[in-house]
Structures are given as C-alpha cells and as structure tokens.
Amino acid sequence: MQSIENQVRERVARFLEVTSVSIPLMNAPMAEVSGPALTAAMCRAGGLGVLAGDELLPEALSNAIDEVRRLAGADARFAVNLRVPPAKAPTPEGIDCQRRMLAALEDLAADLGLEPNTIEELPDFDAQFDVLLEKHVPVVSVTFGGLREEYDERLKEAGIVWMGTATTLREAKVLRAAGADLVVVQGIEAGGPRLNFESSDDEAAVGMSVLTTHAARATRLPVIASGGIAESQQVYGALVAGASAVMVGSALLRTFESTASASFKNVLPLLTDVSMRLTRCFNGRLTRVYPSELVQALDEAGLTYAPYPLQREVMRPILRAAAQQGRDDLACLPAGQAAMLAREESVEAVAARLMSFVPI
C-alpha cells in the first residue's frame, strides 16, 4: 500500500502536468481583487494565477490578459475565469421583483448620481469566449455552470485546458461529462457567491473536505479544493483528502498585490469565525460577505431580492458608483470563513507559506 505522502505526491503531479505550473496552488477569481497584478504574482510564485474576467467587457478583458503577460512573462501559465450565462430566461415574476428593487433603491441610486432605473447586464459571454481563444490563454475557468459541447470542442481544438466549479458531487460529475480537464470544488466555507448550478442552496451547503474526497473518487480528475483554506496545515489536509491542488481567495485579500480597498484590508484582522454573513442582496444568490452597512440595512428591511442575475443588474451600478466615491458603507466585501487569517504580505510569501508541507 502506498504511503499517504506518495499518494499526495502523485495527485499533485497530475495537476502540475495538466497545468504546466510548479506548485499546486491557485488564486480564486475574486471580482475587483484578482486583477492582472495578483494573477501575475501567483504565476511568478509558481502557481496558476486566475484572472477574474467575468465582469470585463471584451476590450478590457483583452487588455487585462495582455497586462498579465507583461507582468508575468509571455509564456506565463494562467487561467481566465468567465461565468456561464443562465440557462433560462428571466420569468415575469423575476422582472417584476427587479422593478420593485429599483424602486426601493431609487433614493440611494440618485444620491450616487445614477439615472433612474439604471441596470447593468452581464457582459456577452460569447464575445468574452472569443477573446480567450484569440489570445490563446493557457487555461479557461468557468463558474455558475459547465460548458456546452460546442465550447468544449473549440477549446480542445485550440489545445486549451478548461475547468469548472462544483458545489456538490452531482455537479462535479456534470463537469466531468461536459469535458472538463479539472474540477474546482467550492466548500460552503468559501467567500463570495455560491456557485451551485445543478443543486439547490440546501444541497450545495457541503463542506470542502467531504466534497473534495467524494469528487476526487467519483470523477478521477484532478480536483482543486477551495473554501476556508488559509494555512499550510489546511493545504496538506485538503491534499490528503483527495485534492490535487488548492485554491485560496480570502488568504490573499491583504496581499500587496490585492486591489481590495484599504478599509477592507484593515478590518480583516479584527474578524472572527462568525463575522461573515450569507446574503442575497448583491446578486440574488447566497453570497458570503463581511456585512457592510448596506448589507445590514437591506437584509433588515425584509426586501424580496430579485433572482440572479436580475438582482446583480440592479446592484452592479450602485456598487460601482459607491466604489468610485469611496463609500465603504455601501461596499460588497466577499470573505470566507478563514478571512481573519489573511496576512499583510506578498503573494509570493503566501505561496511559500502555504506550500511548506507539500511534497513536490
């Protein structure tokens, strides 16, 4: 029987072979945080940097990819994350709910200088996808679902590796059937939006460790564990549980390369394990955040949030304007259960610390 260390070494080797990086570490594609600087820093540290591209229009996405290569080198191995568009069109009930949300937030929007009924739709997925092919990015990451056959075929023809994110064993199997080369599993501990697409919110409330073990056994693909990982012991535990690599998000929030606001970085050391909250106010999906005054006010008001992506369309202009005006009280502050463990250091230092127990 193989020793645990040899089993870990073999699993890690699979991830390194598929991605052509030197350490089994990725950053989470955190909107407004995982920009070119953080992505490139992860690449330089030996991991797979992941650019948060899902909110970028095609031209901005192309420029961001160019910037990653400028900072990390033309041959850098990195991924770009996009979000799969909803499979179903909005219902009349959902649209009515969106109208009520716009009315409820009318005064706030006006205070921020927004025109009445301002919404912001998701960028066009096909146009974004075309950019990734044109730029021949090494790895494509998708969230909120798997890729349809036509997209999988185009990536495979181009020799591009792709991965999806699962919150349950069923979703991991769906991604395997869709042709994914790697599967990220998002434990309930993770910050940001819950990424379930085939499973209900209740079904998707699975812890990282259990989900990692089941997904690795069932899919036989390299599995990347995410959710609540911020220390080297947790990294090794995830690898023992069956992961081939780990993805960290909140652990990088205070890094020099993170574009999180200074006020958010300063509050992180003061948090406890129960400081975060699950809310639907930002996008209609359960999202783990540190509750700003906006979150507290909206949740306590008892408003009925519009379903995803309609709620996101309402909130995106408000969040953008608030950020431009330095309104921290109106911020969206995604953070996982391990956010209080984040340290003020470089991405390279985080990577070295997290990899200290990993046999490579």
PLM regions and their residue ranges:
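Active-site entrance/lid segments in N-terminal catalytic domains of soluble metabolic enzymes
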Residues: 2-218
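Conserved active-site-proximal phosphate/metal-binding subdomains
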Residues: 105-106, 193-224, 229-360
